[in-house]
Amino acid sequence: MTKKLHIKTWGCQMNEYDSSKMADLLDATHGYQLTDVAEEADVLLLNTCSIREKAQEKVFHQLGRWRLLKEKNPDLIIGVGGCVASQEGEHIRQRAHYVDIIFGPQTSHRLPEMINSVRGDRSPVVDISFPEIEKFDRLPEPRAEGPTAFVSIMEGCNKYCTYCVVPYTRGEEVSRPSDDILFEIAQLAAQGVREVNLLGQNVNAWRGENYDGTTGTFADLLRLVAAIDGIDRIRFTTSHPIEFTDDIIEVYRDTPELVSFLHLPVQSGSDRVLNLMGRTHTALEYKAIIRKLRAARPDIQISSDFIVGFPGETTDDFEKTMKLIADVNFDMSYSFIFSARPGTPAADMVDDVPEEEKKQRLYILQERINQQAMAWSRRMLGTTQRILVEGTSRKNIMELSGRTENNRVVNFEGTPEMIGKFVDVEITDVYPNSLRGKVVRTEDEMGLRVAETPESVIARTRKENELGVGFYQP
């Protein structure tokens, strides 16, 4: 009888990536097959996130539901992982004694051993340690699920922003060696992946070891990824302004595989608030990066993160944030009301901004961003955009859906053989969360991948000088 695994995931793209790797790992070691139905599962895993307010209570609420399943099936294994587990492991054990496994973001690769241990002596297992590189050494073989894929290149963060739990829950920065990253991406490309999204809590701080023992830079890595046959688009998430060096900007100038869209969190437009947040950069320095980026790639669009109502934020501070939003002309944002995360320095600050004021500021900020995003979308009306077709549309299963380079979802009429390929689409309609278009050119008509024989290359490139001596001219 097939054993089944159910994973519930909350939070960031890194958590989504971790969950997919857990599923692949437990399939390889124990033969567990994923199921969307918790009642069918032999193992239940909750991959948690501590960024949102009341994250801990959300975890216990979910565990309470699963407790009922365990009462019906005592052999059921329940595991809690992710950032809440790392932060609140002992509390979870005390309050939810029926949980069998508690693991942190850096120990998910040890799940097979943990499950074996629980199956053996029924004793609970808690492992929320921070082994430096071991997790990367034990990743399962990559498995493509469509034309796009996430690839983790580093973990953790050394920035210690005063509001953020990441350094405490995921540890300090650890970079994967470049060879491991490139091999994983090459394997994915061989399975039909056309776009990769490089992941890290502070991805542009990557400093991985190269094959010759030297330390590479993120700019080096981007160029190496772009050289992999089959990879046509590169994205990365999430960056820190302080690590956004000029050599990365130069990659935007000369590497077309790197998309014209960047998510670069700023959090506030007030230098005073940025200092309280421990961001180590000013609003002017942030704008200087954007100015250089647009000089290198004029059509690039920028999204960002904002926290409103941070302790001590005045009306003037908020107005400076709104000015920055207008100056940069952000295309999109993830914006939140400040809520203290236990164990962070900001949790000890006086939360002196009234709740209603926070809500009002968030509304104003989001309305402005939405207006700017719609203006960007309207500029695309009537233009031809290259779409990577990801699958059927969520709105209409008789239509296809894909993304533009600037991360817009486009729905259009097409045929199944277009999935996984590029099409050029004329944008005909603009909506708040998507675009609509009609196909004007398929990938077969683009000449993107023209197979050539060695003889044809020689015939095309062979030249002779005036003495009749042959040479090659690429």
From Swiss-Prot:
The TRAM domain, residue ranges: 378-441
Residues binding [4Fe-4S] cluster 1, per UniProt: 12, 49, 83
CDD domains: Radical_SAM
Residues of the MTTase N-terminal domain: 3-120
Residues reported to bind [4Fe-4S] cluster 2: 157, 161, 164
Pfam families assigned: Radical_SAM (PF04055), TRAM (PF01938), UPF0004 (PF00919)
Record Gene3D superfamilies: Methylthiotransferase, N-terminal domain, tm_1862 like domain
Record key words, sorted: 4Fe-4S, Cytoplasm, Iron, Iron-sulfur, Metal-binding, S-adenosyl-L-methionine, Transferase, tRNA processing
EC nos: 2.8.4.3
EC category: transferase
Entry-linked PROSITE patterns: MTTASE_N, MTTASE_RADICAL, RADICAL_SAM, TRAM
Cofactor names: [4Fe-4S] cluster
Principal subcellular localisation of the protein: cytoplasm
GO molecular function term, any single one: 4 iron, 4 sulfur cluster binding
Similarity remark: Belongs to the methylthiotransferase family. MiaB subfamily.
Biological role stated in the UniProt entry: Catalyzes the methylthiolation of N6-(dimethylallyl)adenosine (i(6)A), leading to the formation of 2-methylthio-N6-(dimethylallyl)adenosine (ms(2)i(6)A) at position 37 in tRNAs that read codons beginning with uridine.
Subunit structure: Monomer.
Protein name as catalogued: tRNA-2-methylthio-N(6)-dimethylallyladenosine synthase
Lineage of the organism: Bacteria, Pseudomonadati, Pseudomonadota, Gammaproteobacteria, Enterobacterales
Primary gene name: miaB
